[in-house]
Design a protein with these regions (language model features):
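An edge-strand/N-cap motif at the start of beta-rich repeat modules
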Residues: 37-67
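A short beta-strand motif characteristic of beta-propeller blades
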Residues: 64-73, 103-112, 146-157, 193-200, ...
Length: 395
């Protein structure tokens, strides 16, 4: 077991102060390569950073040694997403979106204020932020983050809602439709943000993912909408109620991995099936798992294989083409999903051939080699981990 080493606490870095620009910006030299190095700012140079929130702050770990290199104070419930480069992570706070320099282990002064920051999507070399409380859609090139506030394109939906947007390779945008009362579909906009087409047959639209060939999928409570080659297609769920609200795609595969919930009346459904959606054949296949899972359980491997972290503590590996369960990797002990979605539960984050798995019950983070199926490292943390994310490798 590799025991983590505390490297000191960064004092008084609050989300509110950062939003007001009181936290110093990083420098201008952008990191390059898989090491996530560079001399952009601060005294640290954390390799392949992995970030983990806890109640009151965020840890930054060296992705190779799993040593805790930074401990940042951060009030409230905060969410994490890769920013799209090998240096930054997007932190969703009560004030809006904020850019965190994970290599330096410190907040930047790059912020996108707005009530109820929602989905962060990376596609076609662009990162898109959707602010639920305002309906603002803001997109930028993540490789410009090393120079401070990036040049940003903005669009505002007709009504604020819990939505998501994806910028396409041609500069167009796929964006959800809805308001505070209901969400019912998607619209496709061109590079001038003029509507090209729409589909309103997607009740409670939620989540997105991109598959091979720029097929964009969004989930519905009765199936999936797929946008590809200028057309929107509905793939219906095989059950009367078949909600797909969280998806994971891969550029290596035309298959989308999604959760699959069938009990419309459940206070908290603990699903034991996942959906594999073929964006080429427009078909949906359900795969039965030996354990339940949560919205933080879905990931993709380096070859496009579907990965599901089960409540039995195993990473279940599914051949996304055949739907066959090919392996189950032991990582942590059995666990149970909490009733409140903000409460800590195990999560999985995959980068390259390494899967990082958090264990709030044991206050640990594990690294798993997906090729060998071996746990290669374990970090012991002082606080129970909640959100799990990290920087991305450059290609």
């Amino acid at each position: 077991m590799n025991r983590s080493v505390r490297k000191g606490r960064i004092a008084a870095v609050s989300a509110t102060a950062a939003m007001l620009g009181l936290v110093g910006a990083c420098g201008t030299d952008e990191a390059g390569g898989e090491g996530g190095g560079g001399q952009q700012g601060g005294g640290k140079n954390i390799a392949d950073p992995v970030t983990v929130t806890y109640d009151g702050g965020m840890y930054v770990l060296d992705g190779n040694t799993l040593e805790v290199q930074a401990d940042v104070e951060l009030d409230g419930f905060n969410r994490l997403n890769p920013a799209g480069d090998d240096r930054h992570v997007v932190v969703s706070t009560s004030e809006g979106f904020q850019l965190f320099d994970a290599v330096a282990g410190e907040m930047t002064d790059v912020a996108f204020p707005g009530a109820e920051p929602g989905h962060v999507v990376r596609h076609a070399g662009r990162t898109v932020l959707f602010t639920d409380g305002t309906g603002e859609v803001r997109s930028f090139d993540p490789h410009d983050l090393g120079d401070g506030m990036p040049e940003t394109e903005e669009y505002t939906t007709e009504h604020p809602h819990h939505g998501v947007a994806v910028e396409l390779e041609n500069g167009g945008v796929v964006v959800t439709l809805g308001d505070e009362e209901e969400r019912n579909g998607i619209a496709v906009l061109d590079e001038n943000r003029e509507e090209v087409t729409r589909n309103e047959d997607c009740p409670e639209v939620h989540g997105e993912s991109a598959a091979q060939g720029e097929a964009i999928a969004v989930g519905c409570e009765d199936g999936v909408l797929i946008y590809k080659d200028g057309e929107i297609t509905k793939v219906d769920s095989p059950t009367e109620y078949g909600r797909i609200g969280n998806q994971s795609g891969s550029p290596e595969s035309p298959i989308i991995l999604g959760d699959y919930k069938q009990d419309e009346d459940a206070e908290l459904e603990r699903p034991t099936e996942v959906a594999l959606v073929d964006t080429e054949k427009k078909k949906l296949e359900r795969v039965k798992l030996p354990a339940s899972y949560t919205f933080r359980s879905l990931a993709r491997g380096p070859e496009g294989e579907a990965l599901v972290l089960g409540t039995d503590g195993k990473i279940h590996v599914i051949d996304e083409t055949s739907g066959e369960l090919t392996d189950s990797i032991d990582v942590i002990g059995e666990w149970s999903e909490p009733m409140e979605w903000q409460e800590p539960r195990p999560a999985i984050f995959v980068r390259g051939s390494t899967a990082y798995v958090s264990d709030p019950g044991e206050k640990q983070l594990h690294a798993v080699d997906l090729e060998s199926g071996e746990v290669t490292g374990t970090a012991d943390l002082d606080q129970a981990p909640n959100e799990l994310s990290g920087t991305l490798h450059e290609h």
